[in-house]
Curated annotation (Swiss-Prot):
The gene is bztB. One of its GO terms (cellular component) is ATP-binding cassette (ABC) transporter complex. Gene3D superfamilies: MetI-like. The lineage of its organism: Bacteria, Pseudomonadati, Pseudomonadota, Alphaproteobacteria, Rhodobacterales. This is Glutamate/glutamine/aspartate/asparagine transport system permease protein BztB. PROSITE patterns: ABC_TM1. Belongs to the binding-protein-dependent transport system permease family. HisMQ subfamily. It comes from Rhodobacter capsulatus (strain ATCC BAA-309 / NBRC 16581 / SB1003). It is a multi-pass membrane protein.
């Protein structure tokens, strides 16, 4: 209830949008937003007018037309009679494959190098420093080209692995030999590796859109998941017993039994074995071949990104108070156990945020795969499909949207992990 002595409230005036500090910030934000929207509309209209002048329209119907080109490495069934959309999916899967493997390998290698950079051994520390400074100060594209050239030019041709009857009679050996008990052959065409095979099959289920999935693989995945869940329950129970009685029960052999006995029994029942590559007259048959384009890209991405991750790990370790190390030594922990149980767990809070940026950089840097003819998203959608259809704007926008989605997904997952390891405070 207003009192008679209260001063009358001034009414709203348009001048208050500029001179009144309560409204000025809102006015500025609205003006900036309107200018941004006006600029966006102008750009879109300009693109539409230019496309119309060239007799083009803006649509994505080209994705459902026949692709007409083959891909050397595919993770799902694909032929040149499939659509450009399926080629896009294949390129996306290839991108995700090299990105996920690259992030895992670069993290492992970078962590090792980061720890070794702090080694008390002068030679080891200097070697790691040379590695870091060398790899992170040379452009990634050059490393990719170098790895591709080394693999293509220094490895023997497949026929050099063949042992002919004349060579047997003369007691000669082939010019090249396989590695790891004659199971791996690295040629100038690719790396031939043993492939998993089964004597018995549970069948194949079609998920639709020509995506067959082996029931053997689903059964293996289900058993592994159940074993892992059972092991987690067992370890939780062991921890509860330790907290209640002060004595920790034996866990190593039950853990091995829970984790490996079920999957071993399943693999034995399915007749699991390895299909080894065999040399024929001109090339290898059996097993599977990993193309050098994929190998060169993966090695280059791993070594390059690991150099940056090593510096992040080193900085994270140095951020931990030296008193933590001294306290661990006082408790009788050895240096290795101190690093794994005391220092690194605390350093993760410092390491993870910049590590997210390196994962994002590696994923985006994988678009350089076209340099060694690896058919990722850039090679399919942004390469052959773009050239065949002439849909430059649509292809570029799609690629930008896909890479944005991948990056936001990685960032969200890593932020969730970072939140889970944060120091819990009241």
């Amino acid at each position: 209830m207003a009192l008679a002595s209260d001063p009358p409230k001034a009414g709203f005036r348009l001048s208050m949008l500029i001179y009144d500090t309560r409204f000025r910030s809102i006015t500025i934000q609205i003006v900036v937003l309107l200018l941004f929207l006006a600029g966006l509309v102008w750009l879109l209209n300009n693109a539409y007018v230019n496309l119309e002048a060239k007799g083009k329209d803006f649509n994505f119907s080209f994705l459902w037309t026949r692709a007409g080109y083959d891909l050397a490495q595919t993770l799902i069934p694909y032929s040149n009679d499939d659509t450009h959309f399926r080629a896009l999916i294949e390129g996306l899967l290839n991108t995700l494959l090299v990105s996920v493997l690259g992030c895992i390998l670069a993290t492992i290698l970078g962590t090792i190098i980061g720890v070794l950079r702090l080694s008390q051994n002068w030679l080891v520390a200097r070697i790691m420093t040379v590695y870091v400074e060398t790899f992170r100060n040379i452009p990634l594209l050059l490393w990719i080209l170098l790895m591709g050239t080394i693999l293509a030019e220094t490895r023997p041709v497949p026929k050099d692995f063949r042992l002919t009857e004349a060579m047997k009679a003369a007691g000669e050996e082939p010019k090249a030999s396989m590695w790891f008990f004659d199971s791996v052959a690295v040629t100038n065409r690719g790396t031939n590796l043993p492939a998993p095979a089964f004597d018995h099959s549970l069948g194949v289920v079609d998920l639709g859109w020509n995506l067959p999935v082996s029931l053997n693989a689903l059964a293996i995945l289900a058993v592994m998941s159940a074993s892992f869940w059972g092991w987690r329950r067992f370890m939780a129970r062991a921890k509860a017993v330790q907290e209640a009685t002060g004595t920790r029960p034996t866990t190593w052999w039950p853990s091995l039994l829970i984790l490996f006995a079920p999957i071993s029994a399943l693999l034995y029942g399915l007749g699991f074995h390895l299909d080894y590559p065999q040399i024929t007259k001109f090339d290898f048959t059996g097993g599977f071949q990993m193309l050098h384009s994929f190998t060169a890209l993966l090695i280059a991405l791993t070594l390059y990104t690991a150099a940056f991750i090593a510096e992040i790990v080193r900085a994270g370790i140095q951020a931990i108070s030296r008193g933590q190390t001294e306290a661990a030594y006082a408790l009788g922990l050895r240096p290795g156990r101190t690093m794994s149980l005391v220092i690194l767990p605390q350093a993760l809070r410092v390491i993870v945020p910049p590590l997210i940026s390196q994962f994002l950089n590696l994923t985006k840097n994988s678009s350089l795969a076209i340099a060694v003819s690896y058919m990722d998203l850039r090679g399919t959608l942004g390469g052959i499909t773009l050239n065949q259809t002439g849909r430059e704007l649509e292809c570029m926008l799609l690629m930008m949207l896909i890479y944005l989605t991948i990056s936001l997904t990685i960032s969200s997952l890593m932020n969730l992990y970072n939140k889970s390891i944060k120091l819990k405070e009241r």
